[in-house]
């Protein structure tokens, strides 16, 4: 036997256990999370509730996690993908945000919900919009499923290109 066979060629390192803060930061790097959502994900990954809350508090204090920033991004993202204010408000509620944070995020949106509804109808039914009653119903159903209010639905389905 030669000496070369006795030398280990590569040592395997055991992966180091991540701290709760590191795990939370790993989640935040991928996308924004609300405090409640981040805490829930950490506890689902086997981290104790107190440690998860402490990690989230530390990251919030450092500026890595911010419920207001999360809410504003979510409102903008959902509005740009064709969802209305009712849907967006409900989704923000499912992420554990309080009514004040939801109201602030909705107020920060600079777009026009009625124009978003019109754009969605234009994309689905062409530039001329829904032509007959059946198409108007389909357009209204689409907008209602997407979370637009009645006024926006009426204005979008009776679309006038000169408007």
UniProtKB/Swiss-Prot annotation:
GO cellular component: cytoplasm
InterPro entries: RecX_HTH_1st, RecX_HTH_2nd, RecX_HTH_3rd, Regulatory_RecX, WH-like_DNA-bd_sf
Pfam families: RecX_HTH1, RecX_HTH2, RecX_HTH3
Residue segments, region Disordered: 1-21
Any single GO BP term: regulation of DNA repair
Location in or out of the cell: Cytoplasm
Keyword tags: Cytoplasm
Domain of life: Bacteria
Protein function: Modulates RecA activity.
Family recorded in the similarity comment: Belongs to the RecX family.
Stated name of the protein: Regulatory protein RecX
Gene: recX
């Amino acid at each position: 036997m030669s000496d070369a066979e006795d030398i280990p060629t590569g040592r395997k390192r055991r992966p180091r256990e991540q701290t709760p803060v590191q795990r939370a930061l790993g989640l935040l790097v991928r996308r924004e999370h609300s405090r409640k959502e981040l805490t829930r994900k950490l506890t689902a990954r086997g981290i104790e509730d107190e440690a998860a809350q402490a990690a989230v508090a530390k990251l919030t204090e450092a500026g890595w996690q911010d419920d207001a920033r999360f809410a504003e991004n979510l409102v903008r993202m959902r509005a740009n993908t064709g969802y209305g204010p009712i849907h967006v408000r409900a989704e923000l509620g499912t992420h554990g945000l309080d009514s004040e944070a939801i109201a602030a995020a909705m107020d920060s949106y600079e777009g026009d919900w009625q124009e978003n509804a019109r754009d969605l109808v234009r994309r689905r039914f062409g530039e001329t919009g829904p032509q007959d009653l059946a198409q108007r119903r389909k357009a209204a159903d689409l907008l209602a499923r997407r979370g637009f209010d009645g006024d926006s639905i009426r204005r979008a389905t009776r679309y006038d290109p000169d408007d």
